[in-house]
């Protein structure tokens, strides 16, 4: 993946800076594949399994983190193909056919959209829970509808990439299909629906949460409200996700803005290619950072993990109910 892009034949591609940047990004990718991928697979899988094994104690934030964990597993599975395989790189260990490339692109887009949607909905639902505790909208019983909305919306938004894939095979027979091969239009849709809209939703929710936090209301004495650690987890997750995904969406936005036929000098084109590669690397790294935040900030996760291990140890045998789990269910009732 890591190269100076299409200007390998230009003078700047042979400069020491270009070679050093390529080498540095290659080392980072190897470190991520060697350490980040196992961490991401392990913690994301534990996050999903621990919450599914403790459905009775799941809260709405847990549902969104499960969605982000599943998306993280998808991103982790795609990481080796992206970080080591694109055909334009001198460092590539293998090349991808056009069909495989578009398939990976669709999966990557779906995972990124699920991550951003879940982050935005986490912020909005946290505000609802703070403003109106025990509401139906923030109820965990809406899990099926929420997951359907998040994943269904991500798939529909990525449909433009699917149309591009189909039209690349039938354009010789259907002239109108050639109009759907505009990848810049697909990128613009992803930037608008996958980044701008969730970003505005998060900013709106954080502003409302901040305003509620300054107000002293009788609801603040309600012991059934969300644990304060959830607020820290929310802020850390929002900052992490948008911090790691913003460079990637900015690179897509730049591609859209520079697709009007304007030429870019070779020197700047090389810098932009390296910046795009680094942005995609940061996007992949989000899949390993988020479950670590959940692990170390969410106070309920260690208990869920213990119950998961207990169930795995018991197997098909009947296990005695966990007292801590019963207390947590009673507290949420």
Curated annotation (Swiss-Prot):
What transmembrane ranges does the database entry give? Answer: 23-43, 65-85, 102-122, 146-166, 189-209, 233-253, 278-298
**How does this protein lie in the membrane?**
Multi-pass membrane protein
Q: Which residues form a coiled coil?
A: none
**PROSITE patterns for this protein:** G_PROTEIN_RECEP_F1_2
Question: Which top-rank group of organisms is this from?
Answer: Eukaryota
Q: Which cysteines are joined by disulfide bonds?
A: none
Q: Which Pfam families is this protein grouped with? A: 7tm_1
Q: Cite the ranges annotated as topological domain Cytoplasmic.
A: 44-64, 123-145, 210-232, 299-333
Keyword Glycoprotein recorded: yes
Q: Which InterPro entries match?
A: GPCR_Rhodpsn (IPR000276), GPCR_Rhodpsn_7TM (IPR017452), GPER1-like (IPR047143), GPR146 (IPR037487)
Extracellular side residue ranges read 1-22, 86-101, 167-188, 254-277
Which cellular component terms (GO) are annotated to the entry? plasma membrane
* Annotated CDD domains: 7tmA_GPR146 (cd14990)
Swiss-Prot/TrEMBL keywords:
Cell membrane, G-protein coupled receptor, Glycoprotein, Membrane, Receptor, Transducer, Transmembrane, Transmembrane helix
The reply on keyword Cell membrane is: yes
Which molecular function terms from Gene Ontology are attached?
G protein-coupled receptor activity
Outline what the protein does.
GPCR receptor required for the regulation of plasma cholesterol levels. Receptor for CHLSN, a gut derived hormone which mediates an inhibitory effect of intestinal cholesterol absorption on hepatic cholesterol synthesis. Cholesin-binding exerts an antagonistic effect by inhibiting PKA signaling and suppressing SREBF2-controlled cholesterol in the liver.
Q: Which family does it belong to?
A: Belongs to the G-protein coupled receptor 1 family.
The cross-references to PANTHER family, in alphabetical order and at most eight, read: G-PROTEIN COUPLED RECEPTOR 146-RELATED (PTHR24226:SF3), G-PROTEIN COUPLED RECEPTOR 182 AND ESTROGEN RECEPTOR 1 (PTHR24226)
What protein name does the entry list? G-protein coupled receptor 146
